[in-house]
Amino acid sequence: MQRVTVLCVGKLKEKFYIDAAAEYVKRLQRSCKLDIVELPEYRLPEDPSPAEIQKALQAEGAAIRERLPKGGAVVALCIEGKLCSSEELSRRMADFGVQGKTQITFLIGGSVGLSEDVKKLADWRLSMSPMTFPHHMARIMLLEQLYRAYQIAAGTKYHK
């Protein structure tokens, strides 16, 4: 069984995000060993300067690197990442397993994204969409796509 870690900056606060995440975590338990790690989000002022943004990226990046599991595949969610279909995500996850990478870690940055240093650690950069979404919603979207990917691999009727 694959081990999947979702390493994310920021804590879910809104009930609808918490409920959605809990539902997908429950569904995913049959397909993988899932661990969600929430890291503190660096507090930024309302209109941060480029230096303040850089400081936040560095602080959040250090926290990510500290908690990053050793070995396995690393996937960074970022706007410049590769767009892919649900079927392709399913294939990529299976390919990681064939390569002996039974641990897959997905990285979700905070409101200012991921530092370039963190992105360089990734085996694959994935974009959920060319549109911009709140990072909390990106977590829900990722969890749904992980569930869908495992259902595709299992040949169930969930994915149409």
Model-derived features: positions:
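S-adenosyl-L-methionine/SAH cofactor-binding core of RNA-modifying enzymes
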Residues: 40-104
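Loop/turn-to-beta-strand initiation segments
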Residues: 3, 102-107
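N-terminal beta1-alpha1 ligand-phosphate binding loop
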Residues: 1-28
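Short glycine-rich anion-binding loops that position phosphate/pyrophosphate groups of nucleotides
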Residues: 12, 79-82, 110-113
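General small-molecule cofactor/ligand-binding pocket signal
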Residues: 7, 35-37
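Structured adenosyl-cofactor binding patch, chiefly the S-adenosyl-L-methionine
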Residues: 112, 116-160
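Short, well-ordered alpha-helix to beta-strand connector turns
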Residues: 32, 71-72, 122
